[in-house]
């Protein structure tokens, strides 16, 4: 068992190196700079070694996206747990979501706009995605007729705001007002 455990740890360490390198390159130069060849050069492995861990580039992006979902879950949980008022908790979550998208553009892109092999809203949806969605759902008022649809609408609106802000279509300076209006319009 000792050799198998060691090999498993080494495999996991290589996968972490691959995803860390992909994320670092994407954050510095954009996702177009992330290729299997470039990653292999960065971490000093051959391309076949990378392919032994990940089927293709989309799978690497998907692994980075899973990291992002773990991170955003924690960020949203902290935002939801601060205020005692449910409306303030929803606004806090909305602002935390928008801040996350702004502070981690390459990671956010991997999570929501890049091609990956991740399944959303299906039986095979990874736990990281479901758990992040559940944090959003936890701040949706239980009085909503369909909490899942309300959560999807909240998420879609936040994503739209994040994308518009990222592309410079709307001003960053009015985000607090937009978050308050969104929460008020959807849930009150």
Q: Which residues does each PLM region occupy?
A:
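Short hydrophobic/aromatic patch on the recognition helix
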Residues: 44-54
């Amino acid at each position: 068992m000792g050799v198998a455990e060691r090999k498993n740890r080494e495999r996991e360490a290589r996968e972490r190196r691959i995803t860390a390198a992909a994320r670092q390159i994407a954050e510095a130069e954009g996702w177009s700079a992330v290729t299997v060849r470039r990653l292999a050069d960065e971490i000093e492995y051959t391309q076949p070694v990378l392919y032994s861990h990940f089927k293709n580039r989309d799978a690497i992006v998907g692994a980075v996206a899973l990291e992002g979902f773990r991170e955003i879950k924690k960020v949203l949980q902290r935002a939801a747990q601060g205020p005692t008022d449910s409306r303030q908790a929803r606004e806090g979550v909305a602002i935390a979501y928008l801040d996350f998208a702004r502070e981690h553009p390459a990671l956010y892109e991997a999570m929501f706009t890049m091609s990956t092999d991740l399944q959303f809203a299906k039986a095979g949806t990874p736990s990281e995605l479901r758990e992040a969605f559940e944090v959003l759902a936890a701040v949706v008022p239980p009085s909503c007729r369909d909490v899942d649809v309300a959560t999807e609408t909240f998420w879609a609106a936040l994503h739209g705001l994040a994308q518009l802000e990222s592309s410079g279509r709307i001003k960053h300076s009015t985000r607090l007002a937009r978050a308050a209006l969104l929460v008020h319009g959807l849930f009150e």
